[in-house]
């Protein structure tokens, strides 16, 4: 996969935030964690992921460009916190008490589990499914699982199995 081109100013802002938060964590925790690798390989509606064993943060270049300062202020510390929690506590719940503590007490950032960025520009095709009470939009991955007979999905409200609305797909 080609590495997306990120404006140098955006990359510098990401790295400045990362280094500031890492230094803050090292001082607070009296540790000497090294700087993780940063790549811009994240795709889809996911803003970022922390690759624990690789000590790497992968960021979504499209969402970074569309939401620059909010992305840097929220996503970079969020993913760094995952790495720091893994280094300090090992495998624990992804957004559990250790992660919340790392975000709020160490990095001093509100502990939000998900972003609220607009994702229309990065969202893939969806497929309409129906139940007895509403319409549901399934991703292509979930749609293909239904087609292959690997799974079925149920409505959380009425409990009925979702059925593909073929008319809306034409």
Curated annotation (Swiss-Prot):
Protein name per Swiss-Prot or TrEMBL: Protein SprT
InterPro entries: SprT-like_domain (IPR006640), SprT_Zn_ribbon (IPR035240), Uncharacterised_SprT (IPR023483)
Pfam families membership: SprT-like, Zn_ribbon_SprT
S-S bonds: none
Subcellular location: Cytoplasm
GO-annotated molecular function: zinc ion binding
Keywords tagged on the record: Cytoplasm, Metal-binding, Zinc
Positions annotated as active site in the UniProt record: 79
Residues the entry annotates as binding Zn(2+): 78, 82
A biological process from GO: response to stress
GO cellular component terms, semicolon-separated: cytoplasm
Membership in a protein family: Belongs to the SprT family.
SprT-like domain ranges (all copies): 22-163
Cofactor binding description: Binds 1 zinc ion.
HAMAP family in the record: SprT (MF_00746)
Cofactor: Zn(2+)
Record has Metal-binding as a keyword: yes
Keyword Transport applies: no
């Amino acid at each position: 996969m080609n590495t997306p081109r990120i404006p140098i100013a955006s990359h510098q802002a990401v790295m400045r935030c990362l280094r500031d938060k890492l230094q803050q964590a090292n001082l607070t925790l009296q540790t000497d964690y090294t700087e993780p690798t940063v790549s811009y390989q994240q795709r889809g509606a996911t803003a970022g992921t922390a690759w624990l064993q690789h000590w790497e943060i992968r960021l979504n270049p499209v969402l970074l460009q569309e939401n620059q300062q909010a992305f840097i202020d929220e996503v970079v510390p969020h993913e760094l916190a995952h790495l720091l929690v893994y280094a300090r506590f090992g495998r624990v719940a992804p957004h559990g008490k250790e992660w919340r503590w790392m975000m709020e007490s160490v990095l001093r950032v509100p502990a939000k589990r998900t972003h609220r960025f607009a994702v229309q520009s990065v969202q893939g095709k969806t497929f309409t499914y129906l139940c007895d009470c509403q319409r549901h939009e399934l991703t292509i991955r979930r749609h293909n699982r239904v087609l292959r007979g690997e799974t079925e999905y149920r409505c959380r409200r009425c409990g009925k199995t979702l059925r593909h609305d073929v008319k809306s797909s034409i």
